[in-house]
C-alpha cells in the first residue's frame, strides 16, 4: 500500500475495511493515525487535498481483499494495521538487515512511488492528485526526475511544419 499507492504511513495505519471498495478497486484516504501522549489517535489527514480516493492496481486490490479475509473479528471501522509507526520503522530496519540491503525510511516508499510515476510519464498534476499534495509545487520538488522533452517537442514541431 505504501509503495503502490504512495500513501503516508499515518494514512496506512488509519485504514479500516470500510475504506476499501473492491468492486471499484479503490481505497479512500480520509484519516490519519497518530500516537499522542501514549494513546492511539485517529485524526484528519495532513491537508485538505489529502482526502482522496486512490485507484489501486488490480493485483494490490486482490492482495488487500485476501488480507482482509484473514481477519475474523475486525470490525468495519477498526484499523486493519493495528501497529504503531515505531513498529513499522522497526520492521523496516529488521527486514533491511535480514536482506542485507541499505535501510530506507518508510516515507522513502512514497518518494519511490512518485519517482516511478514520473518515470512512467504521468504529469505532475495527476501525480499530485493521487498522492494528496496540497500544491503542485510540492510535486515539482521532484522536477529533476521529470525527463526533458525538448527533443521530442522540436521533432514534433518539425513534423507540424512539414505538414505531416
Predicted stretch roles:
Residues 2-33, 125:
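Short, charged phosphate-coordinating catalytic segments
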Residues 33, 86, 124, 131-156:
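Catalytic-site neighborhood detector that most strongly recognizes the C-terminal catalytic loop/helix
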Residues 24, 32-35, 57-102:
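Active-site/catalytic core of tyrosine-dependent DNA strand-transfer enzymes
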Residues 1-2, 116-117, 130:
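Short alpha-helical segment immediately N-terminal to, or the first helix within
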Residues 14, 22, 141-144, 159:
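Phosphate-coordinating loops and pocket residues in cytosolic domains that bind phosphorylated ligands
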Residues 83-85, 102-121:
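Short basic/aromatic active-site micro-motif
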Amino acid at each position: 500500500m505504501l509503495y503502490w499507492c504512495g500513501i503516508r504511513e499515518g494514512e496506512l495505519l488509519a485504514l479500516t475495511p470500510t475504506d476499501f471498495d473492491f468492486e471499484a478497486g479503490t481505497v479512500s484516504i480520509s484519516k490519519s493515525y497518530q500516537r499522542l501522549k501514549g494513546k492511539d489517535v485517529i485524526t484528519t489527514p495532513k491537508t485538505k487535498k489529502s482526502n482522496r480516493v486512490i485507484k489501486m492496481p488490480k493485483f494490490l486490490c486482490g492482495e488487500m481483499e485476501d488480507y482482509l479475509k484473514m481477519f475474523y473479528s475486525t470490525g468495519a471501522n477498526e484499523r486493519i494495521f493495528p501497529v504503531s509507526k515505531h513498529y513499522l520503522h522497526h520492521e523496516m530496519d529488521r527486514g533491511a538487515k535480514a536482506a542485507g540491503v541499505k535501510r530506507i525510511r518508510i516515507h522513502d516508499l512514497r518518494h519511490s512511488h512518485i519517482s516511478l510515476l514520473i518515470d512512467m510519464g504521468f504529469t505532475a498534476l495527476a501525480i499530485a492528485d493521487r498522492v494528496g499534495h496540497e500544491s503542485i509545487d510540492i510535486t515539482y520538488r521532484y522536477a529533476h526526475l521529470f525527463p526533458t522533452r525538448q527533443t521530442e517537442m522540436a521533432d514534433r514541431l518539425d513534423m507540424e511544419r512539414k505538414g505531416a
